[in-house]
Amino acid sequence: MAVVLDLLANDARPRHPEKAHRPDQPIQRKPDWIRVRAPGSPGWAETNRIVREHGLVTVCEEAGCPNIGECWEKKHATFMIMGDTCTRACAFCNVRTGLPQGLDGDEPARVADAVARLGLSHVVITSVDRDDLRDGGAGHFAAVIGAIRQASPGTTIEVLTPDFLRKEGALDVVVAAKPDVFNHNLETVPSKYLTVRPGARYFHSVRLLQRVKELDPTMFTKSGIMVGLGEERNEVLQLMDDLRSAEVDFLTIGQYLQPTKKHHPVKRFVPPDEFRAYETTAYAKGFLLVSATPLTRSSHHAGADFARLKQARLDRLATA
C-alpha cells in the first residue's frame, strides 16, 4: 500500500491521511495529447524565487497543475491563501487535508507585494476550504483584494472561492470587495458528488453563483468542471443548463488527472474532439466565453481570458 508523505520539519506525515486506507488505484499512462514541458526556464525560476521570498502558497504547486511550467515561465502564479491545509477531503484533489493553522494577518500584504513584484496585470486568488472559520475565510479574501488594490491598482483580480457552505453572509463580504471575476468551480456533475466531492452540495454551489449576480449583476462569474471522472455527456449538458440558469458567464472544462494512487481513478481520457464539441454546445447555450481542452484549468490563461470575456460582453451588448 502506498502512502503519500510530506516532509515538514524533518518529520514525515501523511499528506492525505483520510485516503491512506483506500486501495491503490493504478495511474494510467497519459495519452499523447496530454504532454507538457518540464518547468525550469529563467521566468519559472524568478517566479519561484518571489513566491519563496514572500512565504506564499500557490495552487499551481499544491494541486500539481500540469501547466505550472508554462504559467510560471510567464510569471503567472495563482496564490492559494489561508494556508496549505484544507478541511475538506475531495477525492480528486492533491491539496493536503487536515486541521489548518490560524490565519496569517500579514499574508494579504505579502500577496499584494508579490503581485506588484511579478508585474501581474491579472491575478487569480484561491484558497483552501476553511470550514473551521466562522466566515469561511471571506474576510481574509476581502483583505487580500484590498491589499492588491492598494499595492497594484492596475491589476485586475479574479477570485476562485470555496463554497462557504453554512457560512451566512460570507459571500456578501467577498462580492462587496469587488473582485473583477468571481469563480467557483462545480468540479463535476451532481451524480459524482458523493464519491468525488463529498463535503459539498451541487445545488448550493449553483445557488452561490446565482447569488453573486443578484448582489452585483455586472460582476463576471465563472465556473469549471473536470471530465473523465465517469460522467455521462448528457449530465455535462444538464450542468451547462444549470450554470446558465444562474447566469454564469464563463465555463471551463478540463481533463481530470489522477494525482496519486490513493485518488479517484481516471475513468476515461476524453479526446480533444469531444472537448471541441462541448465548447460548441456551451457557446450555443449562451456562455460569453468557454475554454474546453484537455489541459484547461481555472486559472490557465486567466488574464488573456479576462480580456476576451470583457470584449464578448461588449459584443453581445452591441448586438442586443
From Swiss-Prot:
<keyword id="KW-0004">4Fe-4S</keyword>
<dbReference type="InterPro" id="IPR007197">
    <property type="entry name" value="rSAM"/>
</dbReference>
<dbReference type="InterPro" id="IPR006638">
    <property type="entry name" value="Elp3/MiaA/NifB-like_rSAM"/>
</dbReference>
<feature type="binding site">
    <location>
        <position position="299"/>
    </location>
    <ligand>
        <name>[4Fe-4S] cluster 1</name>
    </ligand>
</feature>
<dbReference type="Pfam" id="PF04055">
    <property type="entry name" value="Radical_SAM"/>
</dbReference>
<feature type="binding site">
    <location>
        <position position="71"/>
    </location>
    <ligand>
        <name>[4Fe-4S] cluster 1</name>
    </ligand>
</feature>
<dbReference type="GO" id="GO:0051539">
    <property type="term" value="F:4 iron, 4 sulfur cluster binding"/>
</dbReference>
<keyword id="KW-0408">Iron</keyword>
<feature type="binding site">
    <location>
        <position position="86"/>
    </location>
    <ligand>
        <name>[4Fe-4S] cluster 2</name>
    </ligand>
</feature>
<feature type="domain" description="Radical SAM core">
    <location>
        <begin position="72"/>
        <end position="288"/>
    </location>
</feature>
<keyword id="KW-0808">Transferase</keyword>
<feature type="binding site">
    <location>
        <position position="90"/>
    </location>
    <ligand>
        <name>[4Fe-4S] cluster 2</name>
    </ligand>
</feature>
<feature type="binding site">
    <location>
        <position position="93"/>
    </location>
    <ligand>
        <name>[4Fe-4S] cluster 2</name>
    </ligand>
</feature>
<feature type="region of interest" description="Disordered">
    <location>
        <begin position="9"/>
        <end position="31"/>
    </location>
</feature>
<dbReference type="GO" id="GO:0005737">
    <property type="term" value="C:cytoplasm"/>
</dbReference>
<keyword id="KW-0949">S-adenosyl-L-methionine</keyword>
<dbReference type="InterPro" id="IPR013785">
    <property type="entry name" value="Aldolase_TIM"/>
</dbReference>
<dbReference type="GO" id="GO:0046872">
    <property type="term" value="F:metal ion binding"/>
</dbReference>
<dbReference type="InterPro" id="IPR003698">
    <property type="entry name" value="Lipoyl_synth"/>
</dbReference>
<comment type="pathway">
    <text>Protein modification; protein lipoylation via endogenous pathway; protein N(6)-(lipoyl)lysine from octanoyl-[acyl-carrier-protein]: step 2/2.</text>
</comment>
<feature type="binding site">
    <location>
        <position position="60"/>
    </location>
    <ligand>
        <name>[4Fe-4S] cluster 1</name>
    </ligand>
</feature>
<keyword id="KW-0411">Iron-sulfur</keyword>
<dbReference type="GO" id="GO:0016992">
    <property type="term" value="F:lipoate synthase activity"/>
</dbReference>
<feature type="compositionally biased region" description="Basic and acidic residues">
    <location>
        <begin position="12"/>
        <end position="31"/>
    </location>
</feature>
<protein>
    <recommendedName>
        <fullName>Lipoyl synthase</fullName>
        <ecNumber>2.8.1.8</ecNumber>
    </recommendedName>
</protein>
<keyword id="KW-0479">Metal-binding</keyword>
<keyword id="KW-0963">Cytoplasm</keyword>
<feature type="binding site">
    <location>
        <position position="65"/>
    </location>
    <ligand>
        <name>[4Fe-4S] cluster 1</name>
    </ligand>
</feature>
<comment type="similarity">
    <text>Belongs to the radical SAM superfamily. Lipoyl synthase family.</text>
</comment>
